């Protein structure tokens, strides 16, 4: 009894695990399921009676319920599809003027709104794209093709790559000095020389439309949430779901509402990029000391002046960090949006992966990564840069960067014009290096892949076979052997032990939604892959973080490496593993491990660094050695922060598992990918996305609740 009183939580967890495993052994697999050993899969017997419930076909006998709950939510995708069809084709018909036929026509309101929004987005994208690359679409939107034929001089010529490069160098120097300027110049020269200028500018035009609009909407909603508790309570659950919702799932309804193309990609990118901007705006405004607000009030500011002149400038750094996050999300979507027709580097990367052309995929992936790193460094430098004050400076000193750029524009135009006379093969290399004229390393990488396969084929095959047959398939079978009732008991019990009745109800409700969907088995497969990746990533991340923390320079270096790897679009991680292991679960899981190790490493280093220096001094004075200090002081105090890293590791792993569906997994991501090609796939895609989001939210809720209680117990913020 004394042990029970001393360690109540331990015995609660022990009792919960005993109940869980007892249920797993007590609930046998029904005869209506067959186990396919080669696939480590439980398959329903098709020769059984069926009945329909809420539009869903149910194949269950009474004793099946403890094994797999009836898919009572099978009606949800159908309802979503019917709702979208009603909104797009029947809801609020109104008279609208049709320019093509020059008369009024009756159109549903939402259809007209989406068409107008599509036209506006297309105009913005074409405008920026033609400034960078040239064209006539923007001019045609204000005139006609006949006018363009009569006035060919009106075509926008586009900016030479030399001018864009000069602009990037000047901006980099303005924000962070010579180092960033040199890096910006090298990135732009690399893109041009390797013949990737046109797709890079197509991607950049996509970012230059999506990022500013996402910033404006995110800032607006963030301010509204700061001013109104009701708005915050309304937005909070939406933001939570959107943070864990796989980006694939959001593409499906976008096709229904906006069709395919760059315009749809920009709109759906905004949907994904706005939530982090809202959260960081709210975080920045909440962190403003009350004294600053009172000083603004005492100075006679009204509400508008207080917000624009006091609060937003004070929260400037957090808001600009939000801009950084928006840009990174836009870049990750630049690749994923290729599935719905977005042009640029993402489309080239997707095409190369479809053809299993690793060389071309690496070239496109490297360009995406370099541009992403460059914009990441620039936006962070902007966030950390102090505001310039021009007191007694001359006109040239105040505007030297603008003047230098104007000079670069003039020189770039002159050199491009002269280049048209110098280069006789029809390609003006001072304007743009065509893709077929640029340097290509695709053959080198493809030969490298062939050499790796020829040299290490047997070793890789042995490892791949061992991992799949002896580790992954047994683990997959164990997860699929988990009865739905036993899993519900485990999750609800964990919620109750960690956070009480409220947490038990929250995580129980989220789990019940997944269990009542028709894809419970696919959710278990997703969970098995994510669990394996998270387990390995956590061990590696915690170990590397603890070792790196022992030396300040090593810790800074590892944080820099984490910054670079976190900047890479997630699709890029699939390229090297496909080189080694082909289209297998092994490839996906190794990509998951690499991607998910980043937050585990970062949060471990930052958590250990957050331990107060006074405790280090007290430990040193007490005569403890480094190992004792780590185990007795640093690790216990940093562990709550490290658990937040585990939370992010889980989210990263789930994202990569879903993206891994592109190379052939059998989890929820595979069904989301199939929904993209189904004209009635919007309901299925959104429902599957919610299932993945709820898996992430279950762990997020449990971990954050535990961390909050642990920090309160330790007396740390």
From Swiss-Prot:
Gene Ontology biological-process annotations: choline transport; glycine betaine transport
All copies of domain ABC transmembrane type-1, residue ranges: 200-379, 523-703
Gene3D superfamilies: MetI-like (1.10.3720.10)
CDD domains: TM_PBP2
InterPro entries membership: MetI-like, MetI-like_sf
GO MF terms, alphabetically ordered: amine transmembrane transporter activity; carnitine transmembrane transporter activity
Cell compartments where the protein resides: Cell inner membrane
Pfam families given in the database record: BPD_transp_1
Keywords of the record: Cell inner membrane, Cell membrane, Membrane, Repeat, Transmembrane, Transmembrane helix, Transport
Regions that span the bilayer: 10-30, 69-89, 120-140, 153-173, 175-195, 206-226, 238-258, 265-285, 319-339, 355-375, 402-422, 452-472, 488-508, 527-547, 574-594, 643-663, 683-703
Gene Ontology cellular component list: ATP-binding cassette (ABC) transporter complex
PANTHER family in the cross-refs: GLYCINE BETAINE/PROLINE BETAINE TRANSPORT SYSTEM PERMEASE PROTEIN PROW, GLYCINE BETAINE_PROLINE BETAINE TRANSPORT SYSTEM PERMEASE PROTEIN PROW
Family, as annotated: Belongs to the binding-protein-dependent transport system permease family.
Job of this protein: Part of the ABC transporter complex TmoXWV involved in trimethylamine N-oxide (TMAO) import. Responsible for the translocation of the substrate across the membrane.
Quaternary structure and interacting proteins, as annotated: The complex is probably composed of two ATP-binding proteins (TmoW), two transmembrane proteins (TmoV) and a solute-binding protein (TmoX).
Name this polypeptide is given: Trimethylamine N-oxide transport system permease protein TmoV
Species, as recorded: Pelagibacter ubique (strain HTCC1062)
Gene this protein is translated from: tmoV
């Amino acid at each position: 009894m004394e042990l029970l009183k001393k360690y109540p939580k331990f015995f609660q967890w022990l009792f919960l695990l005993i109940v869980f495993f007892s249920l797993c052994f007590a609930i046998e697999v029904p005869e209506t399921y067959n186990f396919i050993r080669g696939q480590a899969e439980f398959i329903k017997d098709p020769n059984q009676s069926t009945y329909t419930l809420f539009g869903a076909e149910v194949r269950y006998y009474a004793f099946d319920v403890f094994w797999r709950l009836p898919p009572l939510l099978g009606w949800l995708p159908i309802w979503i599809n019917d709702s979208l069809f009603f909104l797009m084709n029947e809801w609020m018909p109104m008279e609208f003027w049709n320019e093509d036929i020059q008369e009024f026509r009756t159109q549903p309101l939402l259809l007209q709104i989406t068409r107008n929004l599509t036209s506006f987005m297309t105009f913005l994208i074409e405008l920026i794209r033609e400034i960078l690359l040239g064209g006539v679409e923007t001019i045609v939107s204000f005139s006609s093709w006949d006018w363009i034929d009569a006035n060919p001089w009106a075509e926008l010529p586009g900016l030479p790559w030399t001018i864009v490069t000069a602009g990037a160098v000047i901006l980099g120097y303005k924000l962070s000095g010579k180092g960033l300027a040199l890096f910006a110049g090298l990135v732009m020269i690399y893109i041009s020389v390797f013949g990737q200028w046109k797709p890079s500018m197509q991607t950049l035009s996509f970012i230059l439309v999506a990022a500013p609009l996402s910033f404006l909407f995110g800032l607006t909603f963030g301010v509204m949430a700061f001013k109104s508790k009701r708005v915050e309570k309304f937005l909070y659950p939406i933001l939570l779901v959107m943070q864990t919702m796989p980006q694939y799932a959001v593409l499906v309804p976008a096709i229904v509402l906006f069709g395919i193309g760059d315009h749809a990609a920009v709109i759906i990118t905004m949907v994904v990029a706005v939530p982090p901007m809202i959260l960081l705006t709210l975080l920045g405004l909440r962190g403003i000391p009350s004294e600053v607000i009172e000083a603004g009030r005492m100075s006679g500011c009204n509400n508008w002046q207080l917000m624009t002149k006091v609060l937003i400038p004070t929260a400037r750094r957090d808001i600009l960090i939000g801009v950084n996050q928006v840009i990174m999300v836009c870049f990750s979507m630049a690749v994923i949006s290729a599935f719905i027709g977005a042009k640029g580097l993402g489309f080239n990367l997707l095409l190369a992966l479809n053809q299993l052309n690793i060389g071309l995929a690496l070239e496109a992936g490297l360009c995406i990564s370099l541009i992403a790193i460059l914009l990441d460094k620039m936006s962070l430098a902007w966030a950390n840069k102090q505001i310039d004050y021009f007191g007694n400076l001359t006109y040239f000193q105040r505007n030297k960067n603008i003047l230098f750029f104007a000079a670069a524009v003039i020189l770039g135009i002159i050199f491009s014009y002269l280049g048209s006379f110098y280069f006789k093969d029809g390609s003006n290399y001072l304007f743009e290096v065509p893709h077929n004229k640029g340097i290509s390393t695709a053959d080198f990488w493809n030969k490298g892949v062939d050499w790796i396969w020829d040299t290490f084929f047997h070793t890789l095959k042995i490892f791949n076979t061992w991992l799949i047959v002896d580790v992954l398939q047994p683990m997959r079978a164990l997860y699929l052997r988990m009865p739905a009732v036993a899993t519900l008991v485990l999750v609800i019990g964990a919620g109750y032990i960690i956070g009480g009745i409220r947490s038990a109800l929250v995580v129980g409700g989220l789990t019940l939604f997944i269990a009542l969907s028709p894809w419970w088995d696919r959710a278990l497969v997703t969970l098995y892959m994510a669990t394996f990746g998270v387990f390995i990533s956590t061990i590696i991340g915690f170990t590397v973080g603890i070792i790196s923390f022992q030396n300040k320079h090593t810790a800074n270096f590892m944080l820099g490496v984490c910054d670079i790897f976190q900047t890479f679009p997630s699709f890029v991680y699939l390229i090297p593993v496909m080189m080694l292991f082909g289209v297998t679960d092994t490839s996906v899981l190794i990509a998951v491990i690499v991607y998910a190790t980043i937050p585990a490493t970062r949060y471990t280093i930052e958590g250990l660094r957050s331990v107060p220096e006074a405790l280090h001094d007290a430990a040193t004075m007490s005569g403890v050695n480094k190992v004792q200090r780590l185990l007795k002081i640093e690790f216990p105090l940093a562990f709550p922060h490290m658990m937040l890293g585990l939370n992010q590791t889980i989210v990263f792993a789930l994202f990569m598992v879903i993206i891994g569906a592109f190379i052939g997994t059998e989890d929820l991501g595979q069904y989301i990918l199939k929904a993209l090609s189904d004209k009635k796939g919007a309901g299925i895609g959104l429902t599957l996305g919610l299932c993945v989001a709820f898996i992430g939210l279950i762990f997020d809720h449990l971990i954050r609740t535990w961390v909050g209680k642990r920090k309160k117990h330790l007396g740390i913020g």
